[in-house]
């Protein structure tokens, strides 16, 4: 028997065994990541969790993943250096946020006297030349909020919202969250906010930021002309907190933050975690500002001696790291999005029914929009979310309506959708 015939027989035997196993339901399957349901080899970082794939199979020395049994002295020093925490400035220089969208986001929490915290996903653009983030839309997913924290819940519409943003030419540029009033001298971000920001940067890139919206005590207008830090955005609800007076000026401020590349790397390794104390730790500023690390880290601080020489001084290793070492501040400005508005009802608000056709009718017939065409009226992110999750649910309709909203032109296609909606709203 020739070698060719032997190979053919072997292949036939393998095929027969595979068919037998297939009928028995015992065929081998490609192992998938539990979070993203994709093979681990498809990407080094899980797009769902933001962690490295196959962490349990990676060898960690210091703060570096090692793939060889032999490591050079320079690699060892670099691995040890990864365990020394150094503060770095933000890579993003400015965050511009649509004023209407961020004000509607915070106004609901302000109505609850800041006793129900919320978070939202930000969609916009990133300018590589100026290192600027533009936030054009704010979407609030399903979530459960409490006085000190919020917990994301599965959102059935999240995939559709992502498609709408992409069809409008937008991408995910970060997250926003609220928190109760706090003393910035004691705490800037708590560990949950730090991990939220880090996860966002790990999943969607370093062009993401965290916006925090909260009441803040500011110098009164009589004693000082400055009511905010440089680059800090003050929203419209300047007296949203109960008890606010002219003497004790309480404003609602919006600040932007970014975590360091080192923080993102440690998060991907799975070593940055919530402290053992859980949510109770959020009620104490000293505990809330500490993020837990599964391996001890040294904080490296630059000091200048009396003669002017700079040197690094490292503190003793610790598993509790102040979030200030991992975060940097970004200036914030408000602007009006030229792409979409954000005035329509939100799809998910606790204690409030979801929008219905009556709400859409009131919105479309509002006298403020009397001079607008149909294409201009539906150029609202939350109108599109409502239409494309409740009425027009196919991908073709999504692309068509988003194209109408983006161009704001009354094409024949736009007129057809207008006629359909008018018929539905008149019944």
Residue map of PLM features:
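N-terminal beta-strand/alpha-helix entry module and adjacent surface
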Residues: 1-174, 178-315, 320-326, 332-338, ...
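Basic, Gly/Ser/Thr-rich N-terminal segments that form RNA-phosphate-binding interfaces in CRISPR RAMP
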Residues: 359, 376-377
């Amino acid at each position: 028997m020739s070698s060719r015939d032997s190979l053919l027989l072997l292949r036939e035997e393998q095929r027969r065994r595979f068919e037998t196993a297939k009928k028995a339901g015992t065929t081998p399957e490609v192992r998938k990541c539990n979070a993203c349901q994709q093979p681990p080899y498809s990407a080094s970082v899980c797009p769902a969790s933001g962690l490295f794939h196959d962490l349990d199979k990676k060898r960690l020395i210091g703060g570096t993943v090692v793939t060889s049994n032999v490591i050079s002295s320079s690699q060892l020093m670099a691995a040890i250096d990864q365990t020394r925490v150094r503060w770095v400035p933000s890579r993003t220089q400015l965050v511009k946020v649509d004023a209407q969208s961020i004000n509607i986001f915070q106004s609901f929490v302000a109505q609850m006297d800041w006793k129900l915290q919320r978070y939202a996903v930000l969609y916009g653009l990133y300018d590589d030349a100026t290192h600027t983030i533009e936030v054009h839309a704010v979407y609030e997913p399903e979530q459960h909020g409490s006085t000190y924290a919020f917990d994301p819940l599965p959102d059935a519409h999240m995939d559709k919202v992502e498609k709408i943003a992409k069809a409008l030419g937008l991408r995910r540029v970060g997250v926003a969250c609220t928190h109760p009033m706090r003393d910035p001298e004691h705490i800037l971000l708590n560990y949950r906010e730090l991990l939220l920001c880090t996860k966002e940067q790990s999943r969607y890139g370093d062009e993401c930021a965290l916006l925090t919206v909260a009441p803040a005590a500011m110098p009164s207008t009589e004693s000082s002309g400055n009511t905010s830090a440089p680059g800090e955005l003050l929203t419209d609800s300047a007296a949203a907190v109960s008890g606010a007076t002219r003497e004790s000026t309480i404003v609602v401020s919006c600040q932007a933050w970014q975590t360091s590349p080192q923080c993102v790397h440690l998060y991907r390794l799975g070593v940055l975690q919530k402290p053992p104390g859980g949510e109770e730790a959020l009620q104490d500023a000293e505990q809330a500002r500490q993020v837990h690390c599964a391996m001890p880290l040294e904080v490296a601080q630059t000091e200048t001696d009396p003669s002017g020489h700079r040197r690094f001084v490292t503190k003793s290793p610790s598993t509790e790291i102040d979030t200030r070492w991992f975060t940097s501040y970004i200036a914030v400005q408000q602007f009006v999005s030229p792409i979409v508005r954000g005035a329509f009802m939100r799809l998910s608000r606790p204690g409030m029914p979801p929008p219905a056709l009556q709400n859409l009718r009131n919105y479309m017939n509002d006298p403020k929009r009397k001079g607008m065409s149909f294409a201009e009226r539906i150029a609202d992110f939350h109108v599109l979310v409502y239409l494309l999750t409740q009425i027009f649910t196919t991908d073709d309709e999504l692309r068509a309506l988003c194209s109408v909203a983006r161009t704001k032109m009354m094409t024949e296609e736009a007129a057809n959708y207008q006629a359909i909606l008018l018929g539905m709203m008149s019944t």
